């Protein structure tokens, strides 16, 4: 028996109804981004693995467990992109765009992570991605956060989300804090989860967002990052809060919201929802001023960005999206097909969506048309062809018209 072929586990086909929703989400988000000056760009789905090794660090969960990396036929290690930010910064450097800063980029497309598939978490999924590169300061962060809010508002899900906000401080703040955190956690080393024991030596700040109940009890009394802010870090965060209040952006400060990599600084944020169970984050981002230099640029480049999961957005709200319903042209006999093709071509040049139904018996063709919930059918038989006119049936109004092409056009464009 021939094996029934299926997509890979955790990867799904996007059928027309799914694609319609994805398209709506992308177009809506793109339109909001345009109002903020963002321009769309794309990068290859496949990059050298070292692009992500540099950006995420080999000890990160994505690199150590989730990345799709393999040796290609040129004996190079390449990877399916697990996120956009590293690709965008790689593009900035390889295309020598530094002299054009600041730049605002919007990207969208599939990303890949080898994870345990579940609702809202697949191995291939799609993201909206925004990067504001070359601009520093709390005003830039506030503008980016307001963009995220406006996108969620345009998608009618803002009311279902909470903005969780934190400041990672400057490098000096974080360095002192990390030392104090490790000192504290070392006293509980034997009680930490297996995952957190590994992180303690490689990426201790990531322990703060552990989901383990045991870890959570230990973290509850851990030192708080804000206690180690320098004056600069305090002023930066206070300024951001002031701007968000002016803009009317609601937020909740979460001191455990962190980014475990050294190039992140100051603002970190997530928009979460209670509608998706454990997969509660639908949009997340932060400031990453140190990434460009790590990836080979001569200097640091200030930058902030975020990504949102399209599949998760689609799970929060059911979108009823209207679409253009095509007009169906039904030639009665084979001898009417040539005339029908002429009519179809003329109507399409007038931007009218047309499907010609010429296969099978009339009854079966009519059934297919009814299944499409069409409004108009154009019947073309010998009489219509001889008189150079069209018989149009309006299925919603249950009316029938025999008209010339000009009148038909007027009727179909109403």
From Swiss-Prot:
InterPro entries: aa-tRNA-synth_II (IPR006195), aa-tRNA-synth_II/BPL/LPL (IPR045864), Anticodon-bd (IPR004154), Anticodon-bd_dom_sf (IPR036621), His-tRNA-ligase (IPR015807), HisRS-like_core (IPR041715), HisRS/HisZ (IPR004516), HisRS_anticodon (IPR033656). CDD domains: HisRS-like_core, HisRS_anticodon. It is found in: Cytoplasm. The keyword Ion transport does not apply. Signal peptide: none annotated. It is an enzyme of class 6 (ligase). Belongs to the class-II aminoacyl-tRNA synthetase family. NCBIfam families: hisS. This is Histidine--tRNA ligase. It comes from Rickettsia peacockii (strain Rustic).
């Amino acid at each position: 028996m021939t094996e029934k072929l299926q997509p890979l586990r955790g990867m799904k086909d996007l059928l027309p109804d799914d694609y319609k929703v994805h398209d709506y989400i992308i177009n809506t988000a793109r339109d909001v981004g345009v109002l903020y000056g963002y321009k769309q760009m794309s990068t290859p789905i496949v990059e050298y693995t070292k692009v992500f090794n540099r950006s995420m660090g080999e000890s990160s969960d994505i690199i150590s467990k989730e990345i799709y990396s393999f040796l290609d036929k040129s004996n190079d290690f390449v990877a399916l992109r697990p996120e956009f930010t590293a690709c965008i910064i790689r593009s900035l450097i390889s295309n020598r765009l530094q002299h054009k800063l600041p730049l605002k980029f919007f990207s969208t497309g599939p990303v890949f992570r080898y994870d345990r598939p579940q609702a809202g978490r697949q191995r291939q999924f799609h993201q909206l991605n925004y990067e504001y590169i070359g601009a520093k300061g709390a005003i830039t962060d506030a503008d980016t956060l307001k963009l995220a809010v406006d996108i969620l508002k345009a998608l009618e899900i803002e009311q279902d989300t909470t903005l969780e906000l934190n400041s990672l401080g400057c490098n000096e703040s974080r360095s002192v804090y990390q030392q104090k955190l490790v000192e504290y956690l070392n006293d509980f080393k034997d009680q930490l989860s297996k995952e957190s024991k590994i992180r303690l030596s490689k990426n201790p700040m990531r322990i703060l967002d552990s989901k383990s109940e045991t870890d959570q009890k230990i973290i509850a009394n851990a030192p708080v990052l804000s206690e180690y802010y320098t004056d600069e870090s305090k002023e930066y965060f206070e300024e951001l809060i002031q701007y968000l209040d002016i803009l009317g952006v609601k937020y909740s400060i979460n001191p455990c919201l962190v980014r475990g990599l050294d190039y992140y600084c100051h603002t970190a944020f997530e928009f979460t929802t209670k509608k998706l169970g454990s997969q509660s984050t639908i949009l997340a981002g932060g400031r990453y001023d140190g990434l460009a230099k790590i990836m080979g640029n001569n200097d640091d480049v200030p930058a902030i960005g975020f990504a949102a999961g399209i599949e998760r957005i689609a799970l929060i709200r059911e979108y009823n999206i209207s679409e253009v319903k095509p007009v169906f042209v039904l030639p009665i006999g084979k001898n009417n097909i040539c005339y029908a093709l002429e009519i179809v071509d003329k109507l399409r040049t007038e931007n009218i969506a047309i499907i010609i139904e010429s296969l099978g018996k009339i009854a079966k063709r009519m059934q297919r048309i009814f299944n499409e919930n069409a409004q108009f059918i154009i019947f073309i038989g010998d009489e219509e062809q001889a008189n150079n006119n069209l018989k149009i049936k309006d299925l919603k109004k249950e009316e029938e018209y025999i008209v010339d092409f000009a009148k038909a056009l007027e009727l179909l464009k109403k």
